Amino acid sequence: QLKHKITNQGVLNLGIGNNRVTVPGGFGALAKERFDRDILMQSGVKKVIIFEGINDIGAAKSGNSETVARQIIESIQGMVRKAKARKKKVYLGTITPFKGAGYYSHFHEAARLYVNDWIRSQAKKVDGILDFAKLLQDPNDDRRMKREYASNDWLHPNPAGYKAMGI
């Protein structure tokens, strides 16, 4: 689906595996801290896809899932504001299902759902919503990826999953 929206364009993918938005401890600087340098200051960037939050959810050991979700949302809002201020088109990607992953719990799932509900509510404030969660979810259990799209860790999509996402 995504490939139909951005055909014939160069793509600059500056995602970092295990990177986080709000909680230090993953690889590299927090996404919200490197957003200007890595994305907005790059020549020719016209559209930005923000697909963040799963590693922050996984890093949360306990507490209030709404608090974790609100921290992620606040960081995403900051990135959206910065991109819009620079006249970039902004697309938000929902957090994909991860039931079966090592850190999955009802607490973590509640945070994912909270963030995804917020992302979907932003359709009129951004240029598009990429509902990766809906695209990859198992129709029999929306907390889990379809087997044909899931890697063995149940957290990351496999090559077929990334292809379906247009990544």
Predicted ranges, named:
Residues 40-41, 84, 120:
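Non-catalytic positions within long, well-ordered alpha-helices that form the structural scaffold/packing
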Residues 34, 78, 114, 118:
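Short Gly/charged-rich anion-binding patches and loops
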Residues 76-84:
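Surface-exposed amphipathic alpha-helices with a cationic face
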Residues 5-6, 85, 123-124:
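Short, well-ordered coil/turn elements that cap or connect secondary structure elements
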